[in-house]
């Protein structure tokens, strides 16, 4: 169980052909962790802990729309995003001597993306409807694997210390997506999209909706 507060912002430019944007977000989370632990010949114990996490994201992108005939528009796009997540250290209680002491962990990842987007713009009821397909590649740098240093609180000295290393992010993945944008007028836009990131070891699928107001 826990609570998360998330705030963010977006600033964009839309020209006749060129477009660009900057975005950022901040997140603060507070979780209550509970897990059952059992040692030989003992009854199950419940270990509890309060876990605090903060994170921030910022990035930008730019692209250019080029008509290719037949009402189709091809838009090459590039972008970069930096993500930093910090989890405070914490001590479990309630399961002595099997309580864990977990050290602070900070993870920072940067990724760049290059994509091609093919779309068509259709006038609808005084506005426009723009479906699109997109494909490209993403490249990741930084702390690709999470590393957590832990120890059993009941152990003497450095005894009982160990390290858990999570499965690393893939350095390069392919990106595929499809979606649509609806613009009733020049100031308002709503849309939805679905996308997949495909690598040698992992596949991730997302569905998103958005609304934008231009000033």
Positions of predicted regions on the chain:
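Membrane translocator/pore-forming domains, dominated by Gram-negative outer-membrane beta-barrels
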Residues: 1-215
